[in-house]
Design a protein with these regions (language model features):
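Walker B catalytic acidic pair
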Residues: 159
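Active-site-proximal or metal-binding-adjacent scaffold patches in catalytic folds
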Residues: 1-154, 163-206
C-alpha cells in the first residue's frame, strides 16, 4: 500500500529486475525477484512514488470516463463503428463478420502493396491488434470488428508491411505511410478505444 493505493506484489525466480505496472483495470503490480530484499523493494517504490501517483490519477480519470461510457452502451455493441443491439450478436457472429471483411480486403491490399501472406487467423483475447509471424502468418484481434473500417485497413497495412520489413524501422513506417497516409491518427484512435472495445465484447455470449 502506498498512500491508499493498493499494490499487488508478484515474486518469481524468473523475474530479474524490479518493475512497476498499472493495468487498465487500475491494479498496481510490483514485480520483483525472489532474492530481492524488502528494503530494496520499499526504496524502489519510494523512487517511483511521484510517477505512480501521477500515472494512477490520470488512468483513474480515464477509467471513470470508460465506465461512464460503458453505461451508455448497455446492451449495445459496435460493428464497424455502428451501434447495434448486443442481443442480436454472439462472439461467433462477430468473428464471422470480421473474417468476411478480412477475406475481402487482405488480398486486395496485399496485391496493392505487392506482397503476400501465408494465411490469417482471428483471436478472441489477443493482447495486440495484429501480428505477423516470421513465416508471414497474420493474426488479428476480434475487437477490431468494433472499429471503423478505415482503422481496420490500417492494421491490415501495418501487418502486411511486416511481411516486407520484420521490424519497426524507418523503412517499415515509410511503407505504412505510403499506403495509409493518416496512419498516425488511426493508430492513436485505436489506442484510445481498444480497452473500450474489449469491454464491449465481454457482454456477449460465445
Amino acid at each position: 500500500m502506498l498512500d491508499d493505493i493498493p499494490i499487488t506484489i508478484q515474486k518469481s525466480k524468473k523475474i530479474k529486475t524490479l518493475s512497476l505496472n498499472i493495468t487498465p483495470s487500475l491494479e498496481v503490480i510490483l514485480k520483483m525477484p525472489d532474492s530481492c530484499p524488502q528494503a530494496r523493494a520499499s526504496a524502489f517504490l519510494k523512487e517511483q512514488e511521484a510517477w505512480l501517483k501521477k500515472t494512477f490519477l490520470s488512468m483513474q480519470e480515464k477509467y471513470s470516463l470508460l465506465r461512464s461510457r460503458l453505461e451508455t452502451y448497455q446492451n449495445k455493441i459496435l460493428v464497424f463503428d455502428e451501434v447495434k443491439n448486443a442481443n442480436d450478436y454472439t462472439l461467433t457472429d462477430l468473428k464471422k463478420i470480421l473474417k468476411t471483411y478480412l477475406e475481402q480486403k487482405l488480398p486486395l491490399i496485399a496485391q496493392k502493396m505487392q506482397t503476400s501472406y501465408t494465411h490469417f487467423s482471428i483471436r478472441n483475447n489477443a493482447k495486440v491488434l495484429g501480428s505477423c509471424s516470421y513465416h508471414n502468418r497474420l493474426s488479428f484481434a476480434l475487437l477490431l470488428v468494433c472499429a471503423q473500417k478505415e482503422a481496420i485497413d490500417y492494421v491490415i497495412i501495418h501487418e502486411l508491411a511486416h511481411t516486407i520489413h520484420k521490424n519497426h524501422s524507418q523503412n517499415f513506417w515509410r511503407c505504412v505511410q505510403i499506403f495509409c497516409p493518416n496512419y498516425r491518427a488511426l493508430r492513436e484512435r485505436l489506442k484510445q478505444r481498444v480497452v473500450f472495445y474489449a469491454q464491449l465484447l465481454k457482454q456477449l455470449q460465445p
